[in-house]
Amino acid sequence: MALQMIAPFLSSFLPNPRHSLAAHGLTHQKCVSKHISCSTTTPTYSTTVPRRSGNYKPSIWDYDFVQSLGSGYKVEAHGTRVKKLKEVVKHLLKETDSSLAQIELIDKLRRLGLRWLFKNEIKQVLYTISSDNTSIEMRKDLHAVSTRFRLLRQHGYKVSTDVFNDFKDEKGCFKPSLSMDIKGMLSLYEASHLAFQGETVLDEARAFVSTHLMDIKENIDPILHKKVEHALDMPLHWRLEKLEARWYMDIYMREEGMNSSLLELAMLHFNIVQTTFQTNLKSLSRWWKDLGLGEQLSFTRDRLVECFFWAAAMTPEPQFGRCQEVVAKVAQLIIIIDDIYDVYGTVDELELFTNAIDRWDLEAMEQLPEYMKTCFLALYNSINEIGYDILKEEGRNVIPYLRNTWTELCKAFLVEAKWYSSGYTPTLEEYLQTSWISIGSLPMQTYVFALLGKNLAPESSDFAEKISDILRLGGMMIRLPDDLGTSTDELKRGDVPKSIQCYMHEAGVTEDVARDHIMGLFQETWKKLNEYLVESSLPHAFIDHAMNLGRVSYCTYKHGDGFSDGFGDPGSQEKKMFMSLFAEPLQVDEAKGISFYVDGGSA
């Protein structure tokens, strides 16, 4: 179904002669001539048809608040200092001769959010380390072996799990004496989350160290205690890069051997990127206000700020600001349409809307009720406008493929609406075949590939097949945590049974057992993506974006429905996350330390 349309879309990434706009029948005028602003008219939906309500909370992030964001940390003001500090760190990387010291420095750079500044240097060091036959002493250091294993796998190197054999006894079990090496066990725990499917040794390692770390975490020094608690709450491999950087800077400044230049660079870089995020979010907020769709369709969720949080998590690199804005727009439009299918529209109306999206012409729009016309036209203009920009700049007409992702999404929404209307409970397999699409990742990932496609040209003949699987896995990375966090609330609102309920119905098990099963599927999805990162010829960026969807989804839904409700709850972890990333700059003052806002257990 959805994957059948991916191959021709991906072929547009291949180098081709630059086409004229006229050759595609597209000019800017034709592409956006129906552009609308909805803010000056009254609501356009019928009040005569009985409608359900999602009882969604309003957004707390009003326009004036977003427009007031600003920290003053710009490259122009701090660029000279950043450049000097970068040279200091480059020298540090070059002069560090111990393999363990190099590994630990690279790990610090990643955790401090600096890997993008030293991409080439890190690549060179890891290449050397990957071919280094480490000393006997280092091979017997659990921390060194585990950290090396994790970093190399994170960067796409093949590393065998045989490196952990030295830490097993004659029965093939991890030696009980390892429980005395807390630092080593913590590193092994983090490494175990880079497992592939079938690597039981890493599953055994995770179970072994988890038990011991839980038992001893109260009887260790405060900094190590924070690290253990942080890891057990969520492994490093599953964490969002910027949130981890915010948390780790507070830890690093208290560590023995802290390098002040490294810490200062991390803080300055964080603040400069935060300023870039603020600029992009302000632009996005102006677009949303001008569009006026939230006021017109007041039964839907206004989650623009949350959408930008997701977009920035999916493509955290600061140079991808345009991509972040576009993905945030797409995500907010997905929410609007999702609320129409889930809560507001009748089945007959939804069939008309799905048909209009499939036909993709303004004549089809005329059959829709007024509230759907508003939504259709906003979507129509947005897709054409983005497609026009890509065609103008790169000579690739991606509009047919962008359209197709929305068609597949709406068809999946319609299937679920009919399930709900008829009271049907699908099998888990049947549910997942539809719900990985209905979660909305397909348009988001496709837009990312379209915007970054010129930098991600395929190199293998089986590219289309592999990327199709990445798209599906990306959808699963959102769907499974979403169901774990939101299914109770969504069933109360009136929604199709989620994966938990489908498995309970199919297998005749309790909710706790079903939740464990769905969490197991999430872990297996991670393992598949881990293997793609190492074994696949695909550009790592494709796989990273799918992994980032899992990271932001798990972060958002770990403690409930953090997307629909949590960002608006005073004191919620989700609100704290937003404020720490987008609103509150770090105080770059060694004498005072860092102003710390994110709780160590949730970042």
UniProtKB/Swiss-Prot annotation:
Its EC number is 3.1.7.11. Binds 3 Mg(2+) or Mn(2+) ions per subunit. Transmembrane segments: none annotated. Keywords: Chloroplast, Hydrolase, Magnesium, Manganese, Metal-binding, Plastid, Transit peptide. A motif (DDXXD motif) lies at residues 338-342. Mg(2+) 3 binds at residues 482, 486, 490. It is found in: Plastid, Chloroplast. Disulfide bonds: none annotated. Its cofactor is Mg(2+); Mn(2+). Expressed in the oil cells of the leaves. GO terms for biological process: diterpenoid biosynthetic process; geranyl diphosphate metabolic process. Pfam families: Terpene_synth, Terpene_synth_C. (2E)-geranyl diphosphate binds at residues 301, 338, 342, 479, 482. InterPro entries: Isoprenoid_synthase_dom_sf, Terpene_cyclase-like_1_C, Terpene_cyclase_plant_C1, Terpene_synth_N, Terpene_synth_N_sf, Terpene_synthase-like, Terpene_synthase_metal-bd, Terpenoid_cyclase/PrenylTrfase. Residues 1-50 form a transit peptide. Mg(2+) 1 binds at residues 338, 342. The keyword S-adenosyl-L-methionine does not apply. Monoterpene synthase that catalyzes the formation of geraniol from geranyl diphosphate. Homodimer. Belongs to the terpene synthase family. Tpsb subfamily. The Asp-Asp-Xaa-Xaa-Asp/Glu (DDXXD/E) motif is important for the catalytic activity, presumably through binding to Mg(2+). Exclusively observed in the geraniol chemotype of this organism. This is Geraniol synthase, chloroplastic. It comes from Cinnamomum tenuipile (Alseodaphne mollis). The lineage of its organism: Eukaryota, Viridiplantae, Streptophyta, Embryophyta, Tracheophyta.
